[in-house]
Amino acid sequence: MRHPGSPILEVLGLAYGYNGETLQHDVSFDVKRGSIFAIMGASGSGKSTLLKVLIGLQRPSAGEIAFGGVSYCSLDDPERAEIGRHFGVLFQGGALWSSMTAAENVALPLQMFTELDRPSIEALVQLKLTLVGLDTGRDRMPSDLSGGMRQRVGLARALALDPEILFLDEPSTGLDPISARHFDDLVKGLRDGFGVTVIMVSHELPSLFGICDDGVFLDAEARTAIAHGAPHILRDECTHPTVQAFMHRGSIAGPSQSRGCS
């Protein structure tokens, strides 16, 4: 039986980088089922690269990642792809195919990874678009959509196969404050309503403080994780200067109580 709050993803001693250069090493954390988990850190700390490692687009140089208790870093490509079927991913900007309509973008994973007939796929596409608040615009091209609408289409596509974990890479980038807040509310509603676990790369303080209930903080200089916990707890209780500088960018952070890092 799967219990809410039990670990759905476990990361132990992870190291990764590019072209022989290590971005991060000895990174460990657990993601609880049903949580909204933040990957935090300044620019260049390896947040988006960590996401690529977690979803299997890049292999780590050391360490283990386990989904539901199954370690998948050392699996061959077909076996890792099977694990990946449990993941939905929204890359920066939505990453939509420019030559496809909104509906065609959402339909693509259903066409690729299921044997559903066309009417069933059409029904699911409409369901997913409605789920993210897009009752209209299914036949429009990405270039004709606003930034917020493109993100919603990308989110609908990420949800197409009913993932257990939803990965979001800087989902608020390029959105105005109102659109960003609406998107945050949508993500929280998906977690609350459907129990999906969310792992989100973000540097946006309103999103971090507003919807994330756990997280890990990566430091570019130390090249490892220097703090763990909910963003608002790190803001109020972590004394590490790098964490404090990140969390207190602007008045939204509020006063720190500085009681140490978890």
Where are these regions (language model features)?
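The feature captures the beta-strand-to-loop junction immediately N-terminal to the Walker
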Residues: 40-42
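Conserved ABC transporter NBD signature motif
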Residues: 63-71
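Conserved ABC ATPase signature
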Residues: 141-145, 149
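A short, proline-enriched helix->beta-strand linker immediately N-terminal to the Walker B motif
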Residues: 160-164
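Catalytic Walker B motif of ABC-type/P-loop ATPase nucleotide-binding domains
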Residues: 166-169
